[in-house]
Every structure is written in structure tokens, then in C-alpha cells.
Swiss-Prot record:
Organism: Trichophyton verrucosum (strain HKI 0517)
Stretches the record annotates as Disordered: 82-105, 198-316
Name of the gene this protein is made from: RRG9
Name of protein: Required for respiratory growth protein 9, mitochondrial
Species classification: Eukaryota, Fungi, Dikarya, Ascomycota, Pezizomycotina
Subcellular location: Mitochondrion
InterPro entries: NGRN/Rrg9
Length: 316
């Protein structure tokens, strides 16, 4: 086959033929494609010396339909079709833009959100509530839940309804040791507040000289009163039971075995209704009067009791 190179004169004819091949009306074969190109190529004198050994004709396998379509598409001048690529970000945005059904919030959640926007600290109240106050809140609510509702208790104690709701919901109770420690801490806080008030001139009493009982004394009194109430059946506690907490004075009998017996010793029983005028008795009376004077100065009520009869009771 002679050499028939492409020149500027016949390039438009080749391109026109390739464009017509993009939309063929009849099946295109390899032989017809090569013959059509060879018929439209005009030989040039400049390339006559080009031998046929250097020319390799274009060949497409007969059974390669996919390769033929790829060859036609590579020589076509039509612009390629644009394919829209959907990225992962677009899918995530499309999913997030879907409106979700909103559930109605409870009243406490609405109030919590409103407080968070206004005070930037949520429902947390500024006021500290003592453990005794919390216990009284629970007691009032258990007595009458309608009268002492969450709203009424919040208005009464000046705290938020959410705090009241959490206090009523909590079931934790402190042990006796924890309660003692808590009361001691509250006692220290009370003393600190009193000292601050004294510095400001709002209080004139000394907080250290407090007459309030300590936490241990309060708990012991509560324990004693609860036990006495449980034991009583409509009667007052016995005298011995009431004097359990009072320290009693131990009476130790005198040991008179070592003393010598004096037959002339006079007791108070011997002096009742008798009169003796001898000198020894007068001296003893003078000494006894001095002792009585000193004892009257110490114990004035004892003399009043001695002057009366033994059956009467004093007026103190």
C-alpha cells in the first residue's frame, strides 16, 4: 500500500467523516472505515519517497466492539457530557436540613431553659437550703400535697420549683455520724455569719458565748425523747427515769469503827426538851453556836428548815 499522509487540504474532510461516524445510521466495519479514509486522502508529492515498510495501517479487532466504540469516542469533537457528582457533604447537609418533629417539653424544662438564657447558670438557686429546711419541705408536702404543692413551697421558701422538685424526689438520708458532722459545719457557718454581723455593727453579742447546745447534745436529747415517748402509755416517766441524765452525788457512809466511844457525848436527840446549866454544857453550847452561825452564813435555807417542824416543807 502506497503512503498517503494527511495534509492541511484534506484534514477537514477527515474530520467531517469522523463526525459522521459518531452518529452512524448503519453498522460500521473496519474495511469500510479504512476504504473511506483512503478514498478521501489526496497523495502529496512531498512524501513519495516514504516506503511502505514504514507504514502500519490502523487495525481494530473484529470482536472488539468495546474497543471500536472507545476509538470513535476518542476522535469525536462533541463536548463530553457532565456528570454531577454527589459528595458526602451534600448528603449530610440534605439529611440534616430535614425538620425533626419536636416533642412538647415539660414545665420544669421550659423554666430551666429560660433561666439558663437569663442567668447563664440554669435552675441552680443562689440560696443555700439547710438539711433541716429540706426535711421540713418533705414533711409539709407529705402532710398535704395539694396545699403544700411545688409551686406554693417554692414561693414560701424563695427557691425555684425545680429545686423543690429535686428535694422531694431525693430518697437519700444521712446517717447519724453524717448528721453530726453536718450540724457542726452549719454551726461554724452560723458563728462566721455572726462575726461578720458584729464587724458590721449589726450584732452586739459575742458569738463564742453561745447558749445553744451542740449537735451531739441535740441528737442525744432527740434520741432520749423518742425512746421515752415510745415507752410511755399515757403516763409520765418515773422519777428514776427522769433523773437518769442528772449526775447524782454519791453518799459514802462514815467509818466509825476507829472512833473511841465517849459516854459523855451529847447528840441532838438528847438535847430535845432538856436543859443543862453546868459549865461543860455551856461551853459546848457556845462552841456549837459558833458552828451554827458559820453554817447559817453558808446555808441560810437549812436554818429555816431546822426552825420549822420536820413534817412541814419549806417554801423555796
Amino acid at each position: 500500500m502506497s503512503s498517503q499522509p494527511l495534509t492541511a487540504a484534506n484534514i477537514f474532510a477527515v474530520l467531517r467523516h469522523l463526525r459522521s461516524l459518531c452518529h452512524p445510521t448503519r453498522p460500521v466495519t473496519t474495511a469500510s472505515f479504512a476504504s473511506s479514509i483512503a478514498s478521501q486522502i489526496i497523495p502529496s508529492q512531498a512524501y513519495n519517497n516514504y516506503t511502505s515498510t514504514h507504514y502500519t495501517p490502523l487495525s481494530i479487532p473484529k470482536n472488539g466492539a468495546l474497543k471500536q466504540l472507545h476509538f470513535v469516542a476518542s476522535y469525536s469533537t462533541a463536548p463530553p457530557a457532565k456528570t454531577e457528582k454527589v459528595t458526602a457533604e451534600d448528603t449530610s447537609l440534605s439529611k440534616s436540613t430535614k425538620p425533626k418533629p419536636k416533642k412538647p417539653l415539660p414545665a420544669w424544662a421550659v423554666q430551666k431553659n429560660a433561666l439558663k438564657e437569663k442567668f447563664k447558670e440554669g435552675w441552680k438557686p443562689r440560696k443555700k437550703v439547710s438539711p433541716d429546711t429540706m426535711e421540713s419541705i418533705r414533711k409539709l408536702h407529705s402532710m398535704d400535697s395539694v396545699k403544700f404543692s411545688t409551686k406554693n413551697l417554692a414561693e414560701e421558701f424563695k427557691i425555684s420549683p425545680e429545686a423543690i422538685r429535686r428535694i422531694l424526689k431525693s430518697k437519700w438520708r444521712a446517717t447519724e455520724a453524717e448528721e453530726i458532722d453536718r450540724r457542726n459545719r452549719w454551726e461554724k457557718r452560723k458563728i462566721r455569719i455572726q462575726e461578720q454581723m458584729m464587724e458590721l455593727g449589726l450584732r452586739h453579742t459575742d458569738p463564742t458565748s453561745k447558749g445553744d447546745p451542740s449537735a451531739e447534745e441535740v441528737l442525744s436529747q432527740r434520741h432520749y425523747s423518742s425512746n421515752s415517748i415510745e415507752d410511755l402509755s399515757g403516763e409520765y416517766p418515773s422519777q428514776n427515769r427522769r433523773r437518769e441524765g442528772i449526775p447524782q452525788k454519791r453518799i459514802v457512809p462514815e467509818d466509825n469503827s476507829s472512833r473511841r466511844f465517849d459516854p459523855w457525848e451529847v447528840t441532838a436527840d438528847d438535847l430535845l426538851g432538856t436543859k443543862r446549866d453546868y459549865a461543860g454544857d455551856n461551853c459546848a453550847k457556845e462552841d456549837s453556836s459558833k458552828v451554827r452561825r458559820s453554817s447559817t452564813q453558808r446555808h441560810p435555807r437549812r436554818i429555816e428548815y431546822n426552825e420549822r417542824s420536820y413534817k412541814e416543807k419549806p417554801d423555796w
